UniProtKB/Swiss-Prot annotation:
The record marks M68 as: Important for the formation of tight-junction strand-like structures. The gene is Cldn15. It catalyses: Na(+)(in) = Na(+)(out); K(+)(in) = K(+)(out); Cs(+)(in) = Cs(+)(out); Rb(+)(in) = Rb(+)(out). Residues 1, 100-115, 183-227 are cytoplasmic. The chain crosses the membrane at residues 2-24, 75-99, 116-140, 160-182. This is Claudin-15.
């Protein structure tokens, strides 16, 4: 059962990592809203790297942010957290492939596989946590500007990339918990994987049984001889 759980957790974490990789370059982290605007000629959507605008004819123009130092602090922080999440996810994925008991990579014994799986699960949990913090931090700034009556700039709504990132982070955390929990549950010796010593029958009992059989046969022989 634990092998199935750790395998399920591994694939769940791999799916979460894939979704995090799709979330990072996605253009729709935030989308401009028509709330409070009488006439809207274009739609603006942004992510952590560039901003795009679509006019009424559907033509899009994108431009990169001019300088990293000119960006807001939360954008730089979200960049660092998302990149860290993906790196941790890749490390966890590699260690998980080596540590799974259904794989045979490098002829590693079960105790070392359990340690590798524990580290892989911890990496996936940290990756999901970094992604969750980055997405939530970005979303908080969007909602703060949106509900601020004194903010005179363009107001934005949550983009589809944020929902994808939340789902990816949750999958990474749950998958890491599944992988890590199997290592904790298997810390005690498993009877199914216990290596037992070969059975050796007692030589003393065998010798006594042999001597008893010989005495019985001798007794029968003696009676037949006198008859």
């Amino acid at each position: 059962m634990s092998i199935a759980v750790e395998t399920f957790g591994f694939f769940m974490s791999a799916l979460g990592l894939l979704m995090l990789g799709v979330t990072l370059p996605n253009s729709y982290w935030r989308v401009s809203t028509v709330h409070g605007n009488v006439i809207t000629t274009n739609t603006i959507f942004e992510n952590l790297w560039y901003s795009c605008a679509t006019d009424s004819l559907g033509v899009s123009n994108c431009w990169d942010f001019p300088s990293m130092l000119a960006l807001s602090g939360y954008v730089q922080g979200c960049r660092a957290l998302m990149i860290t999440a993906i790196l941790l996810g890749f490390l966890g994925l590699f260690l998980g492939m080596v540590g799974l008991r259904c794989t045979n990579v490098g002829n590693i014994d079960l105790s070392r596989k359990a340690k590798l799986l524990a580290i892989a699960g911890a990496f996936h949990i940290l990756a999901g946590a970094c992604g969750m913090v980055a997405i939530s931090w970005y979303a908080v700034n969007i909602t703060t500007d949106f509900f601020n009556p004194l903010y005179v700039g363009t107001k934005y709504e949550l983009g589809s990339a944020l929902y994808l990132g939340w789902s990816a982070s949750l999958l990474s955390i749950l998958g890491g918990i599944c992988v890590f929990s199997t290592c904790c549950c298997d810390s005690k010796e498993d009877p199914a994987t216990r290596v037992g010593l070969p059975y050796k029958p007692s030589t003393v009992v065998t010798a006594r049984a042999t001597s008893d059989e010989s005495d019985v046969s001798f007794g029968k022989y003696g009676k037949n001889a006198y008859v």
